[in-house]
Amino acid sequence: MTKKSIPKSAKKVFEGILFDVYHWEQEMFDGTKRTFEAVKRIPTTQIIATTKEKKIIMLKEQQPHIGNFTSVPGGQVERTETPLHTTKKELLEECGMKAETLKLWKITNSGGKIDWESHYYFAQNCKQIKTPENNTAGEQIKMYELTFDEFILETQKPEFRNKMFQLEIYKMIKENTLKDFKNLIFN
């Protein structure tokens, strides 16, 4: 996990819908002080959802302000929710599915001037239990299933939205650890 960029002494100077702005005094190397600023984004969840048939769920999405993109299921953690609650909710809303097992894989933080935690979950042996709520005023979603190898290729395309996850996959490709990742997903 990347070190958080906002110290505990920081003061919240603005609270937005997605972002809060923080300021704090920082002593410089010459002893002078300066005001620093960073933003904290509400956390998100990303779900690597699998079926009993060893397929991975992907989404083709369209949103009015973004256009078309691909992604794994997931969403924003509302201020009153936990990441686990959001994971279950998003899997049900976007895919109409419930997981037999949910496991937290990792939490990443973008670091720098934007403090943004992303919680990655493995949702194993997902089962369809209802019709997805995937065509709303704010997003149009089409769900599809891929093999592990197809999934890896899909995450490396420019239209894959989650760039932090894309980097994680690229790192596994470079370090030749995709087999370990596959075992984590399905076992």
Description of each model-found segment:
Residues 9-48, 52-53:
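Acidic, metal-coordinating catalytic segment for phosphate/diphosphate chemistry
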Residues 71-106, 121, 135-138, 147:
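The catalytic Nudix box helix
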Residues 27-30, 51-55, 62, 124-128, ...:
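Short loop segments at secondary-structure junctions
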Residues 2, 68, 79, 113, ...:
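Nudix hydrolase/Nudix homology domain
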Residues 11-12, 105-111:
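Short, solvent-exposed loop/turn elements at beta->coil junctions and helix N-caps
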Residues 1-11:
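Extended interaction-bearing regions that mediate binding to partners or small molecules
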